[in-house]
Amino acid sequence: MIDSDESFTLVDTRPEDSYEGWRIHGAENVPFDPHDEFGDEKTERIEAASNGDSIVAICGKGLTSTPFGFELEQRGYDDVAVVKGGMEDWSKVYEVVPVETANEDLVVLQLQRRAKGCLGYVVGSTAAESAVVVDPTRQTDQFKIAAEEAGLAIERVLDTHVHADHISGGRKLASELDVPYHLGERASERGVEYDYEPLVDGETIALGDVEIETLQTPGHTTEMVNYLVDGEALLTGDTLFVESVGRTELQFGDEDAANGAELLYESLHDTVLELPDETRILPGHVSVTADNRYEVGSPGELIGARLGDLRDDLELLGLDEDEFVDRIVENDPEKPPNYERVIEINTGTEPPDDESEATELELGPNNCAA
């Protein structure tokens, strides 16, 4: 309904602070507790917001929006629907976007986790009928389905780094398929406590005639790597976005963020910006506003850019090193919710208690850009 021309009013029944922190664009906030009286004030707010449209109610998990819908029906509203799983299910909605490639044998699919702006990839060879998955999220079935529909068998799973904003699905997917799981060789320095196959700088993975080269790009994290796909696309993880660059204090801490910024500057200028202008940059995230809009582009459209365009348009890439470091350190965006706990999970030092905790930890947008 959100992407159609159908007219309706979306009512978010969560408390105001939850609504302000993360919501769907266009939603009207009418906080509701089933134990409280449904007074005239709520009715008036709904009448003002709906303007006669059908009403769709949403909450965190469907627990308050369902009785809210019953209350509306008792008051004469006959066109009321409820989002069954609430914002929790909204956080699991994906778009699959094909990437145009010069090599007809090369397949690149961008999987967009719409509510969080997480971007993962299926990269494969049509001739070899094989693929790797890069930066998968916990909803691993989405990646398996995308690969299967493209006629590709997943042979390996790769992460660009230890993520701080969401729980990686990398190990889970590799285990489900009994295939190798890879991180950059410096992941051991982050205290990673599970088995993985390290990729060294310059190491290449072949899928038939398609080659994926590992490039060390420390900065956002020390173990960060980018993956150069057949010389035409760079999967940048949290090194370079289409609207910014990666922040550095999530691993290094506020006191040592300058060290991370220096590493990031070197990675950008000595590695990423040394590539041809025609290289397509495919990032690991797109920033999402509190009301669930992409900072650049739109859901279902490719999030990416020519490196040459970013070189010209992204001010941060034109700064000298001192200016760059100062800008990164001075800029202090809100940290991702629960990022320290998420890092514990992604290094394997402290697994989630259960699926419920994992879901709660991931609610809300990502905040990995500087």
Give residue spans per PLM region.
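Flexible, polar/low-complexity N-terminal or interdomain linker segments that lie immediately upstream
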Residues: 1-21, 91-119, 328-369
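Positively charged, proline/Ser/Thr-rich regional signature most characteristic
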Residues: 1-55
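Accessory terminal helices/loops
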Residues: 18, 70-78, 269-280, 287-370
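Catalytic cysteine-centered active loop of the rhodanese-like fold, especially the PTP/DSP P-loop
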Residues: 30, 41-88
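Active-site environment of divalent metal-dependent phosphoester hydrolases
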Residues: 64, 141, 162-167, 188-191, ...
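Conserved beta-strand hairpin/beta-sheet module of binuclear metal-dependent hydrolase folds
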Residues: 99-150, 227-237, 242-243
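Active-site HxH/HxHxD metal-binding segment of metal-dependent hydrolases
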Residues: 128-131, 136-216
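An active-site-proximal "capping" alpha-helix that borders the catalytic cofactor pocket
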Residues: 252-283
